[in-house]
């Protein structure tokens, strides 16, 4: 590499500090995380470390804007912003599936909230192998136990859309969603939407508390443009504000009492009171 060359990675979840240990100029190393499908999602996360060279950051911003993408600068941390916020959304979907809630019902709850696709279809789109890898990185980093293992499906080559079958079978690049059984029709939790959405909101608060991103408006924009999060709701933080901060916290506390500590409100909520 040339003396002043910049090296960039498209990693979706690994801390940059773990990837740059053998570089002669680690301060010239940066993350440029694009989102799939690249042609449809305009966001690029620009990942920096505490000591990343300012010229490197400016060059990354210049590159991203020149290719007509939207840059979101965030601090190196497992999952960065978007994947960290998405992870509990997909995890809760797997837990609901384990409780024999129909896959279609899970996806419908999210779509009715305003998400572009449901979490089950999203896992199939991302690829079960990739989702499993990201989940493992985040679980190790944040001491979260794996509540649903994708390994059996991965071993059977059911990786999602790219192999023709994951949670759904895929025909002509579209998922075939089976109708819920009679028992599953009776088994749709009243709080299914909150169980899917509020963990994302809680994780967004954690990202702000840890200063992974500078402010809530940037975070909301990043989540909307990186995931398609119900745009009319303004992003996860704006959704909480519109719903009411105290009301949102109370809803999380209620879910925590019913389902366990994964719903425990993050201490960062204190900054919103």
Describe these PLM feature segments:
Residues 1-273:
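N-terminal glycine-rich phosphate-binding loop for ADP-containing cofactors
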